[in-house]
């Protein structure tokens, strides 16, 4: 995108066990202006430093990475294991949250920057995480064909609840 060509970004990715697939994943992510890519498995210390150094941080917080560092927050009316990193990073750094909406088009991508969220972080990590999920849900409802439905968003369940997959 034009943004990543003009402004170096920091982003997080999940390192893959298969070295060939991992190399392909990294090559795809590194094609825009050599962003700083941080492996999720390394933790968030480097992300905190990058934010404090003034780098924009491109963060995709709606993946189910399991129970670690997650809470259950509603997503389409279903409790979804949701990482709390967005709220925690905003609290630790004072970073403003600027939602980015990306649409695939026949010619590439359209990227829309929304106004920064007001009052975020709010009164609690739980409220912030529910707010984030509600925002994502609203955007998915507007263009469901754009969402990454192949990701098993509800694979981690509250204790005692049956897995849907």
Give the predicted meaning of each segment.
Residues 1-3, 24:
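Hydrophobic alpha-helical segments in the ANL/AMP-binding
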Residues 4-7, 41-165:
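Non-catalytic C-terminal accessory region of glycerolipid acyltransferases
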Residues 10-41:
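Membrane-interfacial amphipathic helices and adjacent loop/beta segments
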């Amino acid at each position: 995108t034009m943004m990543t060509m003009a402004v170096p970004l920091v982003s997080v990715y999940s390192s893959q066990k298969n070295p060939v697939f991992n190399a392909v994943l990294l090559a795809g992510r590194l094609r825009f202006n050599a962003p700083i890519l941080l492996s999720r498995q390394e933790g968030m210390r480097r992300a905190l430093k990058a934010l404090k150094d003034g780098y924009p941080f491109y963060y995709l917080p709606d993946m189910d990475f399991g129970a670690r560092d997650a809470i259950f927050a509603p997503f389409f009316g279903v409790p979804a294991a949701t990482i709390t990193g967005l709220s925690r990073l905003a609290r630790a750094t004072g970073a403003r949250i600027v939602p980015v909406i990306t649409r695939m088009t026949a010619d590439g991508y359209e990227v829309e920057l929304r106004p920064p969220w007001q009052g975020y972080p709010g009164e609690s990590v739980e409220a912030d995480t529910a707010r984030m999920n509600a925002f994502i849900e609203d955007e998915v409802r507007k263009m469901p064909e754009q969402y990454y439905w192949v990701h098993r968003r509800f694979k981690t369940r509250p204790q005692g609840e049956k897995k849907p997959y």
